[in-house]
């Protein structure tokens, strides 16, 4: 997915676009119901008539535009939306090639049960780690890691709520206990994982919330109810010149 993002950015730059990295958009200024400018966190005001935001409608309208500048109908629609799933991710580095681990496919689903209802219930608890997806980047791109090594990520879907209830004093232990359980599940399919594991870094829904800036660390946008699909959710804001893109206004996060 990062390679896809890089390709899109490269094309944007090639056609004359200006991309600013490490430069947060802090505010969207609205005048007379229309987009007027974007203010960066450094205080620079950039005049514009259009903004396409992939930050999600909640941060965009509440944090950047400001509720006081939003039409009442827009806020009413926003209030009806439900924050969707986040994830627990274990990033791993190994001291061998994928073939030595028995990995010959880039993506593998590893599950302890075939019951989707059971799996969904577990996503709302801290004893999940029963359903996972492991992606080894080096299978599709042998040059992704240095020779003789490989990288993989192990992911299971989780809601943020149970993690928000963990006291700070217990967060570290809870996070690594969950990572251990997830790794044990993956070992059922690839028994030599732990033997060749050199580096491992877990990320909880709170980690994703911090770095994505999305409510609940959501990776797929809103909950997948029918009312949250593009059939009912408009990508165009009631504020003239403001548009939404990304998983919050599309399908399942499978789009740039």
Predicted stretch roles:
Residues 1-42:
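Helical element adjacent to the flavin cofactor pocket in flavoenzyme catalytic cores
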Residues 7, 11, 15, 54, ...:
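Generic, well-ordered alpha-helical scaffold segments in large soluble proteins
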Residues 9-10, 22-27, 48-51, 196-203:
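Beta-strand segments within the central parallel beta-sheet cores of soluble alpha/beta enzyme folds
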Residues 26-146:
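Mid-domain catalytic core of redox enzymes
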Residues 52, 92, 154, 186, ...:
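Hydrophobic, well-ordered secondary-structure elements that form the walls
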Residues 62-64, 231, 254-255:
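Short glycine-/acidic-enriched loop or helix-start segments at secondary-structure transitions
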Residues 95-206:
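C-terminal segments that line or cap access tunnels to active or ligand-binding sites in enzymes
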Residues 129-135, 191-251:
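A glycine-rich dinucleotide-binding beta-alpha-beta segment and adjacent secondary-structure elements
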């Amino acid at each position: 997915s990062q390679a896809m993002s890089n390709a899109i950015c490269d094309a944007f730059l090639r056609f004359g676009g200006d991309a600013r990295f490490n430069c947060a958009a802090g505010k969207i200024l609205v005048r007379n119901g229309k987009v007027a400018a974007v203010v960066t966190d450094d205080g620079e005001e950039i005049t514009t008539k259009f903004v396409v935001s992939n930050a999600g409608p909640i941060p965009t309208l509440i944090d950047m535009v400001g509720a006081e500048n939003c039409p009442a109908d827009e806020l009413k629609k926003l209030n009806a939306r439900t924050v969707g799933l986040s994830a627990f991710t274990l990033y791993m580095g190994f001291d061998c090639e994928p073939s030595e681990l028995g990995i010959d496919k880039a993506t593998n689903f590893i599950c302890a049960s075939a019951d989707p209802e059971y799996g969904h219930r577990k996503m709302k608890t801290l004893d999940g780690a029963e359903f996972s997806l492991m992606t080894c980047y080096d299978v599709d791109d042998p040059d992704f890691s240095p020779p003789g090594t490989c990288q993989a990520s192990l992911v299971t879907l989780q809601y943020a709520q149970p993690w928000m209830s963990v006291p700070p004093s217990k967060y570290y232990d809870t996070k690594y206990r969950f990572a251990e359980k997830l790794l044990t599940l993956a070992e059922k399919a690839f028994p030599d994982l732990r033997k060749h594991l050199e580096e491992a870094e877990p990320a909880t829904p709170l980690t994703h919330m911090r770095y994505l800036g999305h409510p609940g660390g959501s990776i797929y946008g809103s909950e997948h109810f029918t009312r949250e699909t593009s059939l009912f959710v408009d990508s165009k804001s009631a504020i003239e010149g403001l548009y939404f893109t990304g998983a919050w206004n599309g399908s399942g996060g499978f789009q740039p």
